[in-house]
Amino acid sequence: MTALSEVIAACDATVAAHGVPNPSAGRFDPAEHGAVRAFVLEAVYEGYLLHYATPRAFQGLDEDLRLLAGDALYALGLARLAEDDDLEAVGELADLISLCAWAHAEGHPERAEELWEASARILSPAGGAGAAASVAGNLAPQR
């Protein structure tokens, strides 16, 4: 079972009913991130896609259900990390979620990919700077 299949299965019945059959393997490799972090990254990324782009694992949701499903997947991912006592990852993904919202609200959706790359890197054995560090100089309002 792929991480995206697991994400669909972990959703409530209303959202899971919109899951695509046989979703792709996903973006995040369990061999690189570990099973829990890979599941969480996939869940949170799918939540992001439901809010801002085309989801990979779900189809046929109306606009309201897309937003609710996206929020539910954010919560699912963060809750799974909290159950695993992975507070570093909870903090990183909380930053990522809010910074992606900031990037889209400020008209810079292209920055979201940088944020995702930074978060995926810091949550892998390679480590590195996280999402907040990657945009630290750009958080001030532009005039």
Give, region by region, the residue ranges found by the protein language model.
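All-alpha prenyltransferase/terpene-synthase fold signal
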Residues: M1-R143
